[in-house]
UniProtKB/Swiss-Prot annotation:
Residues 182-205 are annotated as: Disordered. One of its GO terms (biological process) is spermatogenesis. Pfam families: SPATA24. Belongs to the SPATA24 family. It is found in: Cytoplasm; Nucleus, Nucleolus; Nucleus, Nucleoplasm. This is Spermatogenesis-associated protein 24. It comes from Rattus norvegicus. Transmembrane segments: none annotated. Binds DNA with high affinity but does not bind to TATA boxes. Synergises with GMNN and TBP in activation of TATA box-containing promoters and with GMNN and TBPL1 in activation of the NF1 TATA-less promoter. May play a role in cytoplasm movement and removal during spermiogenesis. PANTHER family: SPERMATOGENESIS-ASSOCIATED PROTEIN 24. GO terms for cellular component: cytoplasm; cytosol; male germ cell nucleus; nucleolus; nucleoplasm; nucleus. The gene is Spata24. Residues 17-166 form a coiled coil.
């Protein structure tokens, strides 16, 4: 029979890893918001059109909303994990006490069986009830462990979804930057052509 306290220590390590993953997601979102702000400032300095500025501003607002929603959801999942871990810890301690009581009772039963054969059946029945109760407690602990694993899987899926979203957003930003460079080069080329024509007209006059 596995020792619940040993299991609890391993479970805590897994949960700590899950919490680190949550923090990574939040930090990534905050970094994205910071980058969007920098993009807005840079575009403002380069005389970006009002439509482009409003589009970037809207994206920033949307990212802030998504960040807040994700942060709230992760906080809720973290609360569930903490609650589940608290229950596991309480049940583990209770199970340990009951196991000690069971071992003590079993030792007492063995001594009394030798001394009081008439009470043997009654004492054995009591021990069986205690053992059955311990088995039920272990089943509850296993259920809590499965619940924690499911919560960790949800967190992992949310993190992967966020990474995919960030990848799509970066690709979009690269495309927008490329288009802006093309338009800027085209604008400079058009301006140079107009100046050349203007000088030629002045010479002809």
């Amino acid at each position: 029979m596995a020792t619940p306290l040993g299991w609890s220590q391993g479970g805590s390590g897994s949960v700590c890893l899950a919490f680190d993953q949550l923090r990574d997601v939040i930090e990534s979102q905050e970094e994205l918001i910071h980058q969007l702000r920098n993009v807005m400032v840079l575009q403002d300095e380069n005389f970006v059109s009002k439509e482009e500025f409003q589009e970037v501003e809207k994206k920033l607002v949307d990212e802030k909303a998504a960040h807040a929603k994700t942060k709230a959801l992760l906080a809720k999942e973290e609360e569930k994990l903490q609650f589940a871990l608290g229950e596991v810890e309480v049940l583990s301690k209770q199970l340990e006490k009951e196991k000690m009581a069971f071992e003590k009772a079993l030792s007492s039963v063995k001594s009394r069986v030798l001394q009081e054969s008439s009470k043997k059946d009654q004492l054995i029945t009591k021990c069986n009830e205690i053992e059955s109760h311990i088995i039920k407690q272990e089943d509850i602990l296993n259920g809590k462990e499965n619940e924690i694993k499911e919560l960790q899987q949800v967190i992992s899926q949310q993190r992967q979804s966020f990474r995919n979203h960030m990848s799509d957003f970066r690709i979009q930003k690269q495309q927008e930057t490329y288009m802006a460079q093309v338009l800027d080069q085209k604008h400079k080329k058009t301006s140079g052509t107009r100046r050349a024509r203007s000088r030629q007209c002045s010479r002809e006059k």
